[in-house]
């Protein structure tokens, strides 16, 4: 029987790096881990609230967190930083205030920086967010997937695989649809595979979107 494993965890330390960089004592480890998750959720919620309009999106690729004794460094890798707000400086300051209030700790410094992703549609998280917005706007899933593959191929990737599950186009019976472009060697450890899952909340229910992108080999 086949055994499934997360493609990112399977390659952790080979082609994938950790998103959190810190060390903690055993009794504080779970608290810091939960705090990292709350920081990421706070950033994602802030981005959604401050989008200029519904058709545009921030496109967060990943959030890296580094901790020191009295300092938390957060680096947001984002595809389209100009779509967030008009004044980026003021926006970062407001985001820092929101995160600090959520942490409820005045003894630690908080630094937040934004890094632009060079080829955003080559990142599965950004591409999945694009697909979800199209499906929520009732665009045909076949048309959406075809356009998504075209956008990904423009980012010089070697292969992409997309899975969408649920009541596609409002059909009564849920099903799973696949689409692939290029080569996606999931069993090759040295292959740089990026993967993500993203839910699309439509009027017919929730659709599950999974994307695998093959960038290159080590």
Swiss-Prot record:
InterPro entries: KH_dom-like_a/b, KH_dom_type_2, KH_sf_prok-type, Ribosomal_S3_C_sf, Ribosomal_uS3_bac-typ, Ribosomal_uS3_C, Ribosomal_uS3_CS. It holds the Pfam family Ribosomal_S3_C. Its main location: plastid. Residues 47-118 form the KH type-2 domain. It is found in: Plastid, Chloroplast. Keywords: Chloroplast, Plastid, Ribonucleoprotein, Ribosomal protein, RNA-binding, rRNA-binding. One of its GO terms (molecular function) is rRNA binding. One of its GO terms (cellular component) is cytosolic small ribosomal subunit. GO terms for biological process: translation. Coiled coil: none annotated. It comes from the Eukaryota. Part of the 30S ribosomal subunit. Belongs to the universal ribosomal protein uS3 family. HAMAP family: Ribosomal_uS3_B. This is Small ribosomal subunit protein uS3c. It comes from Ginkgo biloba (Ginkgo). The lineage of its organism: Eukaryota, Viridiplantae, Streptophyta, Embryophyta, Tracheophyta. The gene is rps3.
């Amino acid at each position: 029987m086949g055994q499934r494993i997360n493609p990112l965890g399977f390659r952790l330390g080979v082609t994938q790096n950790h998103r959190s960089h810190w060390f903690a004592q055993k009794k504080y480890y779970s608290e810091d881990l939960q705090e990292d998750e709350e920081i990421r959720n706070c950033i994602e919620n802030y981005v959604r609230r401050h989008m200029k309009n519904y058709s545009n999106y921030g496109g967060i690729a990943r959030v890296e967190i580094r901790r020191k004794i009295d300092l938390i460094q957060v680096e947001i890798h984002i595809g389209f930083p100009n779509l967030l707000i008009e004044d980026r400086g003021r926006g970062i300051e407001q985001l820092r205030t929101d995160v600090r209030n959520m942490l409820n700790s005045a003894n630690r410094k908080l630094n937040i920086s934004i890094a632009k992703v060079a080829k955003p549609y080559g990142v599965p998280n950004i591409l999945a967010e694009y697909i979800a917005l199209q499906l929520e706007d009732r665009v045909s899933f076949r048309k959406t997937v075809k356009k998504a593959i075209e956008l990904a191929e423009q980012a010089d990737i070697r292969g992409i695989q997309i899975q969408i599950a649920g009541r596609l186009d409002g059909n009564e019976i849920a099903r799973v649809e696949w689409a692939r472009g290029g080569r996606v060697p999931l069993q090759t450890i040295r292959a740089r595979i990026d993967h993500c899952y993203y839910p699309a909340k439509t009027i017919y229910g929730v659709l599950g979107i999974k994307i695998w992108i093959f960038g290159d080999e080590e």
